[in-house]
């Protein structure tokens, strides 16, 4: 999906809960990164957003919402560039307050496409065989395969660990 969107749109925005892998996924698809958690980069972006934008695309702008003015600068840069896949924006789904929201003048429609990212599913974690889905059960579809039941300990462990990529491979003690 990300590769297709980078070929189709000039910028993409990846949103989702903290720790679900937005930055890692973005870096996997990007060729350069600006981390706005770095105070010096953030100062540059506040001074003049164009100072952090470069031609080594796709450029990942991590935690873009820390400098809301970047949204319009990126939108304008998308208008100036003929190429697709210029920017990957990551960060919080919500700006901190109304004052910050007021700093964004344009929606980015047609230039910046939003991708929602979620924690990993039990199938992605290798804990499900994809025989039964919640949607199948909701739609009352016939279930034709038996699945080895999880014991209560395994179900509890999946709930506690969640679908966070950073938890993969941790022992029970480490993930607690």
Give the predicted meaning of each segment.
Residues 1-176:
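Phosphate-binding site recognition
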């Amino acid at each position: 999906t990300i590769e297709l969107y980078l070929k189709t749109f000039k910028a993409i925005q990846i949103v989702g809960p903290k720790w679900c892998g937005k930055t890692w996924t973005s870096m996997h698809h990007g060729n350069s990164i600006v981390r706005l958690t770095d105070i010096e980069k953030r100062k540059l972006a506040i001074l003049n957003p164009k100072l952090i934008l470069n031609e080594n695309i796709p450029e990942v702008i991590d935690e873009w919402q820390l400098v809301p003015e970047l949204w319009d600068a990126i939108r304008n840069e998308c208008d100036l560039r003929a190429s697709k896949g210029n920017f990957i924006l990551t960060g919080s789904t919500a700006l901190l307050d109304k004052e910050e929201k007021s700093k964004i003048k344009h929606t980015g429609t047609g230039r910046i496409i939003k991708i929602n990212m979620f924690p990993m599913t039990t199938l992605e974690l290798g804990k499900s065989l994809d025989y039964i889905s919640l949607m199948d059960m909701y739609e009352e579809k016939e279930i034709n395969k038996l699945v080895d039941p999880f014991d209560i300990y395994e179900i509890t462990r999946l709930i506690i660990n969640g679908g966070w990529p950073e938890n993969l491979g941790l022992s029970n003690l480490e993930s607690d």
